[in-house]
Curated annotation (Swiss-Prot):
Enzyme class name: hydrolase
Keyword rRNA processing tagged: no
Species per Swiss-Prot/TrEMBL record: Pseudomonas fluorescens (strain ATCC BAA-477 / NRRL B-23932 / Pf-5)
Keyword Cell inner membrane tagged: no
Keyword annotations: Hydrolase
An example molecular function term from Gene Ontology annotations: mRNA 5'-diphosphatase activity
InterPro entries in the record: Nudix_hydrolase, NUDIX_hydrolase-like_dom_sf, NUDIX_hydrolase_CS, NUDIX_hydrolase_dom, RppH
Gene Ontology terms: cellular component: cytoplasm
Biological role stated in the UniProt entry: Accelerates the degradation of transcripts by removing pyrophosphate from the 5'-end of triphosphorylated RNA, leading to a more labile monophosphorylated state that can stimulate subsequent ribonuclease cleavage.
Motif (Nudix box): 38-59
Protein name, entry field: RNA pyrophosphohydrolase
Segments forming domain Nudix hydrolase: 6-149
Gene: rppH
Family stated for the protein in its record: Belongs to the Nudix hydrolase family. RppH subfamily.
EC number annotated for this UniProt entry: 3.6.1.-
């Protein structure tokens, strides 16, 4: 599903532990790291997509996490021209994302990247909250900065 402007609806997942660190995942067979993310199907809400992607990419269930916050609006990034599939219709030029800040409330041993037939990640680690800004691919950096900045105050609030 691609909107009229060419952006694919998507959710981004910032999973935190009790130390305030975030889960940083390595793309399979690459030296590229990112937060888990994935598309929103036509019949899904962003929250539905969050839980589906969380299970597919990280192996966690709804009961393993607590939602702390979600970005107010959509955050957009454009794909570099070399990644745009110019022969696909409708043309997708980027992603528009709702970002969720989650707290892991179960044991971290529940994190599994290999539960699907086509895993997206082959490794993960806990990193400091702002660490991803200096590590993510350049074209996603501004969206990461905006999401982390907007959601940071909720990390400090313990319900």
């Amino acid at each position: 599903m691609i909107d009229p402007d060419g952006f694919r609806p998507n959710v981004g997942i910032i999973l935190t532990n009790d130390a305030g660190q975030v889960l940083w995942a390595r793309r399979i067979n690459q030296d590229a790291w990112q937060f888990p993310q994935g598309g929103i199907n036509p019949d899904e809400t962003p929250e539905d997509a969050l839980y589906r992607e969380l299970n597919e990419e990280v192996g966690l269930e709804r009961e393993d996490v607590q939602i702390l916050a979600c970005t107010r609006g959509w955050l957009r990034y454009r794909l570099p021209q070399r990644l745009v599939r110019t022969h696909s219709q409708p043309l997708c030029i980027g992603q528009k994302q709702k970002w969720f800040l989650l707290r892991l409330i179960s044991n971290e041993q529940r994190v599994r990247m290999d539960l699907t037939g086509k895993p997206e990640f082959d490794g993960w680690r806990w990193v400091s909250y702002w660490y991803p800004l200096g590590q993510v691919v350049t074209f996603k950096r501004e969206v990461y900065r905006r999401a982390l900045k907007e959601l940071a105050p909720r990390l400090l609030v313990r319900d």
